[in-house]
Amino acid sequence: MAKLIRHNGAPAVEINGEIFPPMMATIRTNNRDSIIVDKEYYRELGKSGIRIFFLICDTIWLKPNAIELFEEEANALLEVVPDAYIIPRIGLHPTNEWIMENPGEVFKYNDGTSPEAYLFSESYETLLPGMYSLCSQKWREKAGTELLKTWNQIMKLPCAGRIAGCFLAAGGTSEWYYILPAVDEEKGLYGDFSESFKREFGKYLKSTYKTEENLKKQWKNNNVSFENPIIPGLDKHYYKHQVDIDAMMPRNMYANSDSPNPPNNGTNIGSFADFDKNVDVYDFWRAWHIGVADSVLYFADLMKKNYPDMLVGAFYGAYGCTDYFLNGTCGGTVKLLKSKSIDFLASPSVYENRLNGGYAGQRQPFDSFLINNKMYVVEDDTRTHMENDFYRDKYDVYDMTDTIERMKRDFGRDICINVQAWWFDQ
């Protein structure tokens, strides 16, 4: 039985009565359609004290040989670290055939297009015919059925006694974000006009306003309804990006020059939306994020109902990575923290300050996890001198000394701020 307990003031993993230290490992050897196993590497990780390993897995819906690939890797790990516990990191992506058969469940822009999207994850890479909606109820139901089919087969394997939890993965790089931006000013595009999101948006509005009279009053728009929620246009999103471009003066400014007028299109106050004029924008982004969180909850509820003794978690909550705001993966964090089906959420540390002298701060307000008796797990995907030239230069890491110092810093930070972590051999 795996569960979270309070230990020395913070959540800790307990499995069958044993408490585990705050470092785990995610091993990326399930490389697309093959396995690259380095048993000696596994052995050394085990010797260092790491006992909980996240292994990559997909559903048999997506990969008919998913169980065979997972079992091969699990057996290789347990051969050299026999007391290891495993949390499968299971991808819930639909097949391209399903996407083609369900156009209403695919992200759609205002011009009616649903562009192709390049999906890249640890074990699956493909050009999607369209970005599947991360709030699609049809996808939830189909992927949920396939999740249980796959999990039931995993639990029949000889290694089933070493399975301690389930890590739910979907969207770009398995991190529950839309690959396509909701708003693309350069191309004059905005969304999402898919049937799935409009249903989700309407559901959110009904839950928030109760009656359409209240909705129309708050939005100052008599044309809006729960059945037909209006997607805010580009002008409504001026505060997000275009205001910064317009603020860059195209002429020289001198000390005695007149102060320039702050850019304004009638919907913003500086780099903020004017809430009184943009309640619809606020509601749009809330629904955009809550819809993704509700999908995480759908699968988490499914797992806890069928396997209550398993830990359940997912990537979600990239507050400290503001580029991801458009992609729907942070605004529903509190809802997830309040759920009994969620044990932990994870995200990598911030990428922008990983250089020497940097801090690699967190994307999550992790003290909120302590308040809610949940665990925050930082993915220490620390780049090393073994990376390609681009990352060696980007993160200023050129030799073994740089690598060791960087890893010591990141691990020390985890200990000092009292968070769980996993090492990811990026």
Where does each model-flagged region fall?
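N-terminal carbohydrate-binding accessory modules
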Residues: M1-L45
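Structural preference for beta-strand elements that scaffold enzyme active sites
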Residues: P22-M24, I52, D83-I87, I163-F167, ...
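Acidic (Asp/Glu)-rich catalytic clusters
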Residues: Y42-K47, E73-D83, P158, V334-K340, ...
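Short catalytic/ligand-binding loop motif for oxyanion handling, primarily in non-cytosolic enzymes
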Residues: L62-K63, P94-M100, G172-Y178, G320-Y324, ...
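Polysaccharide-binding and catalytic clefts of secreted carbohydrate-active enzymes
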Residues: N102-L336, I342, Y359
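Hydrophobic targeting/anchoring helices
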Residues: Y307, G313-Q426
